[in-house]
Amino acid sequence: MSRLEQRFAQLKTEGRAALVTFITAGDPGYDTSLQVLKGLPAAGADVIELGMPFTDPMADGVAIQLATLRALDAGQTLQKTLQMVSEFRVDDQTTPIVLMGYYNPIHRFGVEAFVAQAKEAGVDGLIIVDLPPEHDAELATPAQASGIDFIRLTTPTTDDARLPRVLERSSGFVYYVSVAGVTGAGSATTEHVTEAIARLRRHTSLPISVGFGIRTPEQAAAIARLADGVVVGSAFVDKIATAESPEKAIDGVLTLCAALAEGVRNARIG
């Protein structure tokens, strides 16, 4: 059983959803980013998505685009992102880490080398936003063969004809993008999310995590009552962007994480 499977199974027995947190690797610099990464589990993160900086992040909103630029300007590379996971794993062998990003940097790195090094570093899953299931042979197949889950994105515009194809080779969990558009957009209504989750459950038994537009403990709690996971990204990135110092960036992210975790953990009580 993979770390992702173990974590979602554990949370199911506890009767609560997972808090899935996203940060961009290397934002605003390697050392600060690593400290944030290491601090997230104690602050309540159940699963961590780590963004792989890329020069053309087309699916991301302004906040994450700027985070990517900060990371690249600070010298972040795919090799350093894998190194960051390795350093995290020295002290934490249980929290799942999912790398999220685009295929181009992996293709340039070399798929075989990337999969081998990602596995060795302790990466548990991949979300590649611009690689559809028609291209499974390029990365999904070798990744899953090495024990790395391949997580698919579904959206409000993924129709019933397309959905089975998208979900067919998914593993780890399903990431439902609740608002069509770029990251950081407005949040969907609970009615919409309820209907979407019911539709997804007709096609998959995998845990379903919902993201895009979730910023507050109240919003996180509302989604945690419906989904298996709550994904928060832009809100953390904004904390880093507006911090006056690296120390305040770390504190801002971890304080927000603790508040969101409390919302998620208490969502189904009462």
From Swiss-Prot:
Can you state which reaction this protein catalyses? Answer: (1S,2R)-1-C-(indol-3-yl)glycerol 3-phosphate + L-serine = D-glyceraldehyde 3-phosphate + L-tryptophan + H2O
Q: Coiled coil located at which positions?
A: none
Which keywords are on file for this protein?
Answer: Amino-acid biosynthesis, Aromatic amino acid biosynthesis, Lyase, Tryptophan biosynthesis
Record keyword Cytoplasm present: no
Report the EC number(s), separated by commas if there are several.
4.2.1.20
Task: Provide one Gene Ontology cellular component.
Answer: cytosol
Enzyme active site: 49 (proton acceptor), 60 (proton acceptor)
Pathway it belongs to?
A: Amino-acid biosynthesis; L-tryptophan biosynthesis; L-tryptophan from chorismate: step 5/5
Per the record's keyword annotation, is Repeat included, yes or no? no
The Swiss-Prot or TrEMBL record describes its family as follows: Belongs to the TrpA family.
This protein's assembly is summarised as: Tetramer of two alpha and two beta chains.
List the PANTHER family.
TRYPTOPHAN SYNTHASE ALPHA CHAIN, CHLOROPLASTIC (PTHR43406:SF1), TRYPTOPHAN SYNTHASE, ALPHA CHAIN (PTHR43406)
Q: What does this protein do?
A: The alpha subunit is responsible for the aldol cleavage of indoleglycerol phosphate to indole and glyceraldehyde 3-phosphate.
Q: What is this protein called?
A: Tryptophan synthase alpha chain
